[in-house]
């Protein structure tokens, strides 16, 4: 499972790299709404990040319910046990992003978009907390970190275009890069301990 988590986090880093590479080369196109384009990155990366978090929490707990017949926890064993829960989290994440994008594009009032997006954000994180973060006390600090960082995207959504994008860039560094490094560190530490 650790290798699967690292591979998935590498995909997140690669997609983020491509987005920022595109951003640097298209910075001259000041007419482009960078924020709305950013959502395409998020539609791919955020479900992956949520799934890697769930996998890490399952692994960290060493809970028997996630183990396969060989007594291993892996992507397949977690999905077999909890695919309905994971699909629900991914769907809630999709709606969170969809309402944000609709607000960004002006198809929905920004305040309504924020409210609806926040509802789906809270629903997805409530499920993660209930079914995965709660499995082990060591999971909770990471859960709270992710919850706080992701909540700040909602705050940044309220800023004007310039400050919103600067905030999103900073938040992406913490939610993707530092998070990926943290997961890598925790996995390395676990491997050394076992």
Specify the residue positions occupied by each region the protein language model found.
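Polytopic alpha-helical membrane-helix bundles and their juxtamembrane interface segments
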Residues: 1-40, 45-194
């Amino acid at each position: 499972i650790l290798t699967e988590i690292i591979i998935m986090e590498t995909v997140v880093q690669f997609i983020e790299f491509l987005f920022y590479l595109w951003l640097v080369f298209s910075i001259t196109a000041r007419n482009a709404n960078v924020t709305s384009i950013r959502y395409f990155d998020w539609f791919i990366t955020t479900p992956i990040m949520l799934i890697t978090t769930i996998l890490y929490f399952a692994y960290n707990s060493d809970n028997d319910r996630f183990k396969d017949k060989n007594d291993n926890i892996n992507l397949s064993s977690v999905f077999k046990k909890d695919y309905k829960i994971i699909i629900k989290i991914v769907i809630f994440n999709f709606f969170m992003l969809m309402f944000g994008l609709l607000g960004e594009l002006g198809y929905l009032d920004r305040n309504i978009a924020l409210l609806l997006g926040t509802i789906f954000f809270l629903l997805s994180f409530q499920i993660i907390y209930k079914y995965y973060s709660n499995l082990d006390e060591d999971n909770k600090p990471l859960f709270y970190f992710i919850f706080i960082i992701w909540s700040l995207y909602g705050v940044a959504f309220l800023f004007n275009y310039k400050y919103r994008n600067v905030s999103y860039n900073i938040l992406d560094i913490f939610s993707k890069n530092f998070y990926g490094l943290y997961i890598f560190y925790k996995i390395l530490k676990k491997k050394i301990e076992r």
